[in-house]
Structures are given as structure tokens and as C-alpha cells.
């Protein structure tokens, strides 16, 4: 399963959003995890998209760590080890 398409202004309506940066191995682990579970998500580039970076900071209270996981508009955590519980 692939991540669903990114549409501006709909982050609040999506069940799962992952803020990432290109080349981040932890971000890829998060993507692989959710894909393996068949859980649709949207993947935003928080490194190159200033709007998405600001959005990520609003959820994470300024924490720049990626991946930043948001589910149903609720911040679950940043970084990747075990999948966050939501």
C-alpha cells in the first residue's frame, strides 16, 4: 500500500500524517511499518516545504526530530524506535 496523496489544508482530516526529510532512514522505517500494516498515511517533506515544517513544529512544540507522527490531529511523537501508540 502506498501513502495517500498530499492535499493542502486537509491534514486535520487525515488519520495518520508523517513529517519526514529526504534520505532519513528512520523516516523510511516509519513508512515501511505503516505500509506493512496497510495503514494509509500522508508523508510531508518537513525539510524542503516550509509550510509543512511550520505545521510539524506546531504539533511537536518546536522539536525538529523526524519522523514526526500525528494521528487524527494529535501529536504522537518524534523519532522512530518502536511505533508510537495512539
PLM regions and their residue ranges:
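Local sequence-structure signature of Cys/Sec-based thiol-disulfide redox active-site neighborhoods
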Residues: 3-42
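Short secondary-structure boundary/capping segments
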Residues: 8-10, 58, 67
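Residues at the C-termini of beta-strands that transition into short coil/loop
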Residues: 22, 45, 79
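Glycine-/small-residue-rich active-site loops that bind phosphorylated ligands and cofactors
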Residues: 25, 48, 76
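Thioredoxin-like thiol-disulfide oxidoreductase module
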Residues: 45-63
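Structural micro-motif
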Residues: 60-70, 80
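Non-catalytic, surface beta->alpha helical segment in thiol-disulfide oxidoreductase systems
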Residues: 71-86
Amino acid at each position: 500500500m502506498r501513502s495517500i496523496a498530499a492535499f493542502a489544508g486537509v491534514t486535520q482530516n487525515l488519520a495518520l500524517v508523517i513529517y519526514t526529510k529526504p534520505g532519513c532512514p528512520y523516516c523510511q522505517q516509519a513508512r515501511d511499518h505503516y505500509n506493512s500494516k496497510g495503514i494509509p498515511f500522508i508523508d510531508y517533506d518537513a525539510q524542503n516545504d516550509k509550510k509543512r515544517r511550520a505545521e510539524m513544529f506546531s504539533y511537536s512544540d518546536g522539536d525538529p526530530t523526524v519522523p514526526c507522527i500525528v494521528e487524527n490531529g494529535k501529536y504522537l511523537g518524534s523519532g522512530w524506535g518502536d511505533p508510537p501508540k495512539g
